[in-house]
Every structure is written in C-alpha cells, then in structure tokens.
C-alpha cells in the first residue's frame, strides 16, 4: 500500500490520474495522509473507477454535488465511478488517514456484459442517484461491512494468492453493498455522472460560488 500526499490529473482535465493502475490487474491500494496534502484537502476530481475507503484515524468531509458527509475514524464508504467529489481533513487532534481501494469494476465482473456485471454491478454504477454509500459503526449491517473492509486492507501483496484473496474480499464487500443500496437504487436519479463538461462547469461553480459568474465564464470552464 502506497502512502500518498497529493493528487495527479490528466492534462486539461479534473479526472484523476492513477499511477500504477494496470490493465492486467486494475487495482491500487492507497494510504492517503490528508494532513500532508496542500491545504489539507483533495480538490474536486473524479475517476472512472470505484473508490472504496476506510478511515484509519481522524475524520474527513466528503463533498459531492449531492451534499457533504462527515466520516470519522472507523467509518467508511463507497464512491461510485464518475462521481465528482472532494475531501477535506477535519480532525486537528489526530492524523487524518484514509485507506483506499481503487479498482475498475472489471476486477469483480470479468468480461464486459457478463451476467455478474448485469445483475450486481451495473444496477449500482449506473444509478445517478447513488454518489456515495456511507458506512457507519452503530448500524449492524454497515458494521459488518466495515469489519470486512478494515480486514481487506490487512492483506499483504507478498502473500501467496494475494490477487485472488483480494478479489474475493472485494466481491464479498460489493455483494453486501449491493444489498444495502437496494432502497437507494429504487429512487429516481436525474443528473448524468458521465458528462465531463458538466463536471468541469460544476467544479467552476463550486470554486467561484462567492463571485458573480457569467455564462461566458461558465462555458469557458468546460470548452
């Protein structure tokens, strides 16, 4: 697991560049030390991968177009692919450290169009109303997922069968998230997560909301 203190973007975009992300095993594990980021925050960005995270210590705030959620130590969650988000370190008493699994859904689903993708993956990642699936201690079902999530970060890449064990752990977690998200999937969503130009305009609005924004300025942010 790599310690990270900054974020990289694709040129001319706010899509996150993921160093070390390979097609033959589309997954990376990160330990984000938020206090070492410039300004103690990760700016607005998105990625085409799933973000599954667990708060090792401290607390962070996630911002998405749908609102803000505070995640203290011991909590966690899932950020859907293509969802615009930013994070801020909140705790001033302890280190704000976040553990992350970043992976392409093909790691779990296999070939595109597979039965697994159609039944268990697509219903979640194509639901525009699902930006975040938050997990907090105190809720029995969510606590079960959090325990599995915390344990999954203890797998060592040096041990025999690591890739298979990791995929097995992530698959079990995903299936539980699928069940947990049932009520969320039943709600109707309106916005399009995959439109990059809309994302760029939303970032501009979030960063300049105190100013008077003109239509030409907003258009220039995306074109």
Which positions does each model-derived feature cover?
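Short histidine-centered beta-strand/loop micro-motifs
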Residues: 40-46, 88-90, 110-113, 162-164
